A protein has these predicted regions:
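Class I S-adenosyl-L-methionine
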Residues: 1-307
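Class I SAM-dependent methyltransferase "Motif I" SAM/SAH-binding loop
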Residues: 312-316
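Conserved SAM-binding loop of SAM-dependent methyltransferases across substrates and taxa
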Residues: 319-325
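Ser/Thr-centric signal marking residues that sit
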Residues: 32, 317-318
Length: 325
């Protein structure tokens, strides 16, 4: 469900119920040279203006909520100082860096990036910022190609041949930067899916296991415990329990592999313009952010069916292109 309210951002924030929003994304205007905004472009006016909005934004966020602030070098320093004061440096999550088109008219340094500052309302309750590797731009195509190749070999030549091809492909891919983790995913299951065998021992006191319901009996290890009986039964009924040398392991699938969100992103600003063109909205906004960027931030931080707010979308950006994702 999407709703757009046409009103001044500050008035909108005052009407929002406290602690009702999971995620806020904003691309605040600056250096507008326009009379349409409620501040002039002097530093003091802008700082007071952004501070008023961020104070109300913090109040609107749930305890587990996060805010993302798109900004460039023009106002990066001022906005970060203000955000640190309002949210606290302890709740600063990090800075995403997005690439921009190369500019040839710079007098000194060619600036080819912008920033997205990220803060939690309360870092102790913030999401883990984990994301499926198949959704990360750096991994998506290589991993999907690998899974497709192995599935095809499995269908045509069987599990043993798929296993051999997988080892060859992993040897090559794992030499690339960021792909070393693939060395673990060296097995193919009875459906042609890639997985690795995850150890089910835990750093706890040794114990034996006797679960008659699934006919599972394990001797205690010398210095480690076993996963809980509930965990072992769950894996059994999900057909994710396998054994090597009479020891149980979990099938951990490549398609479910996660990683922390990466901070340097390959979402170019010009893609936002193309996204609007696809919607028949060419020229509607001067600097729209790409759908991929907004989607990435939401996937990192926002559970399904959450309420998301952008209280500057009419002024700059992406109610049309971003939140369809």
């Amino acid at each position: 469900l999407h709703k757009v309210f046409i009103m001044e951002a500050l008035e909108c924030l005052k009407r929002i119920e406290k602690e009702s929003i999971q995620t806020i994304y904003i691309d605040p205007p600056y250096n507008t040279k326009s009379s349409n905004f409620e501040y002039e472009d002097a530093h003091a006016d802008y700082e007071k203006w952004i501070e008023e909005h961020l104070i109300l934004a913090k109040a609107a966020l749930k305890q587990s909520g996060c805010i993302f602030i798109s900004i460039d070098d023009n106002k990066m320093a001022e906005v970060k100082i203000i955000a640190n004061e309002i949210f606290g440096t302890r709740n600063f999550l990090g800075t995403f860096i997005t690439k921009q088109a190369t500019r040839s008219n710079a007098k000194h340094i060619n600036i080819t990036h912008e920033y997205v500052l990220s803060y939690a309302k309360n870092k102790a309750f913030a999401p883990g910022f984990k994301i499926l590797r198949t959704l990360l731009p750096i991994y998506a195509k290589p991993l999907k190609d690998l899974m497709r190749t192995i599935k095809n070999v499995f269908k045509q030549k069987g599990q043993a041949q798929a296993q051999l091809i997988l080892k060859e492909q992993i040897k090559e891919l794992s030499q690339k930067e960021h792909f070393n983790f693939l060395k673990n995913y060296n097995l193919v299951d009875e459906k042609g899916e890639i997985y690795f065998a995850k150890d089910l021992s835990t750093p706890s006191h040794p114990r034996s296991v006797a679960i008659q319901e699934i006919n599972l009996f394990l001797e205690p290890l010398k210095s480690r415990g076993w996963s809980s009986d509930e965990k072992l039964k769950e894996l059994h009924y999900q057909n994710r329990l396998i054994f090597k040398n009479n020891r149980p392991y979990e099938k951990y699938y490549l398609k479910e592999s996660q990683d922390n969100c990466l901070s340097v992103l390959d979402f170019y600003s010009r893609q936002g313009t193309k996204d609007l063109e696809k919607l028949g909205l060419k020229g509607l906004f001067k600097t729209p952010k790409p759908v991929g960027l907004i989607k990435y931030l939401l996937l990192c931080s926002t559970p399904k069916n959450s309420i998301i707010l952008d209280f500057f979308c009419r002024q700059r950006d992406n109610s049309a292109s971003g939140y369809r994702s």
